[in-house]
Regions:
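Mid/C-terminal beta-alpha module of Rossmann-like enzyme folds, strongest
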Residues: 37, 229-283, 322-340
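Alpha-helical substrate-binding/gating segment
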Residues: 204-212, 218-245
Length: 340
């Protein structure tokens, strides 16, 4: 009996890609009758997602829907989510991949960095390392936060509003330093407001916290995870260079109304409105993003938090009430850097 040979890295990559492609075809068949090509297109649309968590995995799904022939690689810290990523049609690899990994020698025309700062001691350094995988031809997108904007007295805020000075806040410093690394290299930045979906976000925190030392009338700016992902896809596809985009639904809502709307939706059992005890403090910002919308041709599916809780019934693909035709992969992991 002959000895079986161990699979080479190339064979392993091919097998994983074949599995990912089969999953992609099955997903496509359940949602569309359009033909799906499985191999690279003449203009390469391959994408590397650094940090394919809740946001990054949604970007990967959106990119594959837009460019079915693309190869999408998801780079993670561990292999815990790799099986789930494969089910989405994504080829997974760990950050510290072996030198003989089948993807080790290549760069990508499109890269999105969506890993949160909480997962790294040297966040700007992590972003700089990710830039080495970009070939400069398509677009590199870094997902930052609207928390970098300095105005918090309730006034208007858009893409070009002033940001904090370096040295004001260590949390913001990490983001602004990482942004500069990206912009100087020709990449683009998507500053995202507070991210949420039916089971994650400020509303979930409010509903489980009886007393909050904050103002009920302070403004919060939000964007649904699905809309943040579609914004990133639009930014990538635009091939923009050294641009700053702002992700927000453009309809700020008070903390008190976030709790009120969530309770009135009826989607959260035994939900009780928290007591907001503060009467002083920052009022927040009133954010709009006209330049982002016009330059990318983008608008949010969930036009406001109120609309999500009322017109949409707090129902999205993350909701326990959602009944997909196929099993779904719902990554968890660290929360993304929250804007406001």
């Amino acid at each position: 009996m002959g000895l079986s040979r161990a699979p080479t890295p190339t064979r392993t990559f091919e097998r994983k890609m074949q599995k990912a492609q089969r999953n992609r075809v099955a997903a496509a068949a359940s949602t569309s009758d359009a033909p799906r090509r499985l191999w690279s297109e003449p203009e390469c649309r391959d994408l590397l997602v650094v940090g394919p968590g809740v946001l990054g995995s949604r970007v990967a799904v959106g990119w594959l829907a837009k460019y079915p022939g693309a190869v999408v690689v998801g780079q993670t810290n561990t292999d815990a989510s790799h099986e789930g990523l494969e089910s989405l049609g994504v080829y997974p690899r760990v950050k510290n991949f072996d030198a003989d990994d089948a993807t080790a020698g290549r760069t990508f025309p499109y890269v999105v960095f969506s890993a949160p700062p909480s997962g790294s001691e040297d966040y700007p350094g992590e972003v700089e390392s990710a830039l080495k995988y970009w070939d400069g031809k398509g677009c590199f997108v870094f997902t930052s936060s609207s928390a970098v904007y300095a105005n918090e007295a309730g006034e208007g805020c858009d893409e070009d509003s002033p940001v904090y000075e370096i040295g004001t806040n260590p949390r913001v410093d990490r983001l602004l330093t990482a942004e500069k690394v990206v912009l100087d290299a020709g990449g683009s930045v998507c500053r995202l407001a507070g991210l949420y979906h039916s089971e994650r976000g400020a509303h979930k925190y409010f509903l489980k916290t009886p007393k909050l030392d904050s103002r009920a009338d302070a403004l919060v700016n939000l964007i649904h995870y699905e809309d943040a992902a579609s914004l990133c896809v639009a930014a990538l596809a635009s091939k923009s260079k050294s641009s700053v985009f702002l992700g927000t639904d453009g309809v700020p809502v008070t903390r008190g109304d976030i709790a009120k709307l969530s309770i009135e939706s009826g989607a959260y059992e035994d939900a009780v409105s928290p007591e907001f005890t503060a009467v002083d403090g920052p009022m927040g910002r009133s954010m709009t993003n006209p330049r982002t919308r016009s330059s990318l041709g983008w608008s949010p599916k969930y036009e406001s938090f109120q609309a999500f809780m009322t017109s949409h019934g707090a129902l999205d693909t993350y909701s326990p009430r959602y009944k997909p035709e196929r099993p779904r992969f719902s990554p968890t992991g660290r929360p993304h850097q929250q804007g406001a």
